[in-house]
Amino acid sequence: MKLEDLHYENNPGACRICVVEIEGRRNLAPSCKTECMEGMVVQTHSPRVMNARKTVMELILSNHPAECLTCSSNGHCELQAIAHDLGIREIRYKGEMSTFQIDRSPSIVRNMNKCIMCRRCETMCNNIQTVGALTAVNLYGFRTGYCR
């Protein structure tokens, strides 16, 4: 499974797709937030790890529009690739999904209905481009400082 793209210039540990099992620790840990230590024994593909990753991905997809065939990212979508690698063929958890208005401004158009809360856009905007226009609002998405 290729997880590097989700962590490019970003490691808030928010998505939990990269969890690993570390010998001597009870809980799984996000690999993007875990410092390597001498003698550390890490399992990256144990049944426990793969089950946790699959469950996390299923939960992410449960609040994500099932519009893959009409999405402009179809065929080169990281979510599709990870879901495929984890053997996810259908959405196991169903229910009411969050809905947001599309956030439009002269500089950006963002569809928060597709947000998976990885915080990559916030990190890139604030830390890499140093614009500071995006901030975390709550568990349901982000709001730009320019659009209301």
PLM feature spans:
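Fe-S ferredoxin-like electron-transfer domains
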Residues: R16-I17, I22-R148
